[in-house]
């Protein structure tokens, strides 16, 4: 919903519950998941508030289906902008993450957008770790640790973050089974993003379909056996 100008009664990055008071008609324009009663606006959803002081816009973004950052989590991110000393990274969250140059390379780098774009460009996918986050500042990422870094190729699949544990399986059993049966690699982010890497397009497609099946049936029992049967049937057909 897009409303008229409001006087806001919430802070930037504040988490709001359904029915929580956001603001009333005044200086700011209200957008997103809100409803109006008289002159007052309330949140429709469990969401996070963003306040754009420059453009005088307050917005409620739903948290459902989005990833809430946690320090130590491994995430699949997409570079969306390049600054002078860092990259902005979409991590499937209401909060845009920051990847500083110091968390990418230890070698001296000429600080310029052109130089940074040679390391990571807009649209590149990365596997990164969240090293810090609180509600007062954006998540900070690193890719300096082993197995982290740019993901050069693969097919991106997005699922609700809460269903990622079912894709991984107990002690990684589900991921290992899919990889072994299909000869592919699954790069799994705790933010609901999975990259399927493989040389055979048909097997990559089967892996994607298997992930979608896990997503749809995550609440059921006996899922590992059904996924194995599903893959074996697809390979025979």
UniProtKB/Swiss-Prot annotation:
GO CC annotation: cytoplasm; exosome (RNase complex)
Residue span, S1 motif domain: 72-144
Main localization of the protein described in the UniProt heading: cytoplasm
Matching Gene3D superfamilies: 2.40.50.100, K Homology domain, type 1 (3.30.1370.10), Nucleic acid-binding proteins (2.40.50.140)
Domain KH: 152-211
Localisation: Cytoplasm
Signal peptide range: none
Organism superkingdom: Archaea
Keyword check for Plastid: no
Family statement drawn from the similarity comment of this UniProt entry: Belongs to the RRP4 family.
Subunit record text: Component of the archaeal exosome complex. Forms a trimer of Rrp4 and/or Csl4 subunits. The trimer associates with a hexameric ring-like arrangement composed of 3 Rrp41-Rrp42 heterodimers.
The protein's name: Exosome complex component Rrp4
Organism annotation: Thermofilum pendens (strain DSM 2475 / Hrk 5)
């Amino acid at each position: 919903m897009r409303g008229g100008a409001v006087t806001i009664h919430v802070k930037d990055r504040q988490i709001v519950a359904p029915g929580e008071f956001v603001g009333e008609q005044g200086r700011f324009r209200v957008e997103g998941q809100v409803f109006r009663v008289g002159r007052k606006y309330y949140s429709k959803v469990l969401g996070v508030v963003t306040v754009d002081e420059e453009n005088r816009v307050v917005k409620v973004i739903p948290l459902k289906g989005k990833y809430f950052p946690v320090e130590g989590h491994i995430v699949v991110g997409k570079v969306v902008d390049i600054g002078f000393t860092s990259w902005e990274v979409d991590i499937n969250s209401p909060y845009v993450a920051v990847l500083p140059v110091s968390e990418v390379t230890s070698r001296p780098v000429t600080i310029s957008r052109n130089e940074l774009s040679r390391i990571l460009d807009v649209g590149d996918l990365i596997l990164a770790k969240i090293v810090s986050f609180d509600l007062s500042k954006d998540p900070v990422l690193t890719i300096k640790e082993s197995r982290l870094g740019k993901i050069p190729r693969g097919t991106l699949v997005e699922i609700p973050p809460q269903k990622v544990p079912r894709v991984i399986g107990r002690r990684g059993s589900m991921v290992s089974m899919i990889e072994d049966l299909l000869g592919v690699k699954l790069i799994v982010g705790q933010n609901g993003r999975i990259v399927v890497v493989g040389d055979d397009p048909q097997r990559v497609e089967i892996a994607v379909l298997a992930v979608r099946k896990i997503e749809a049936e995550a609440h059921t029992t006996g899922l590992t056996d059904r996924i194995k049967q599903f893959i074996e049937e697809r390979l025979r057909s």
